[in-house]
Amino acid sequence: MSFIKDIFQKTTELSDAEFDYSITSDFNFIDSLNEDCTAIVMEATVVYFEIKNIPVLLKTGKRHAARVYKIYYNALHEICKHTGGFFNCYSPTSFLMIYPKEKFDLATVVNIAMKTADLISIGLREPIEKLCHNNFSIGVDHGNILGTKTLCNGKSNQIVWFGRTIEKAITISSLSQRPFFVGISSKVFHDLDESMTKTTKHILGIKKEVDVWTRMSYQFENVKKHLYQTNFHKSFDEEE
């Protein structure tokens, strides 16, 4: 059959071709990629957002699950536009928000993650909970990631991203102990100053300094690591 011959020829071309890539922090560079063997590599902070209850929602019907997914999609896409990040639909239950190092320091991205958690869990609670229990978690890590095009039109959410940074952010998100938690890697945590790691609370009328983040151990690629998680939120309203 001719289509099998065509597939074989294309597969052979791809397997023999050099996998070229360009190092950049400019997402507009995506327009110059093709669907064959070119990619971009960038150092960036990745915010991985997981809708925790899509598997449960699927039991009530595919349309219901897809409707909920679209609600989260719209909110996160608008947040990414507002904050200047790069938005990507990663899976039927998750999204990536990507912030290049050259334009965003780690503290800025952690602030965005905490504000996102606040907006989704509190600001959008009412419309979301008309449809479902609002249940998500966020994982954040920093490092090199590679993106390659899967379709010739090059839309951002049709770029496939690879990297240990993404895998670690996924693992951190999956270990969230409660809904709405933001988890960050130790690499990200140790880059934050005290204004991001400590806060003041009144306990029994006494003003006390408390930790914003709780440390926990986990295994990643058979190596013991630490992550830090919090349910302290910040608000986008603080920007106004």
What is each of the regions a protein language model found here?
Residues M1-S32, Q177-E240:
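Intrinsically disordered, glycine/charged-rich C-terminal tails and inter-domain linkers
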Residues Y73, H77, D118-S121, R125, ...:
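Structural signal for well-ordered, non-membrane alpha-helices
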Residues D141, R164-V188:
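Catalytic/regulatory signature loops of cyclic-dinucleotide turnover enzymes
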Residues T83-V109, P127-W161:
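Catalytic core of nucleotidyl cyclases, primarily class III adenylyl/guanylyl cyclases
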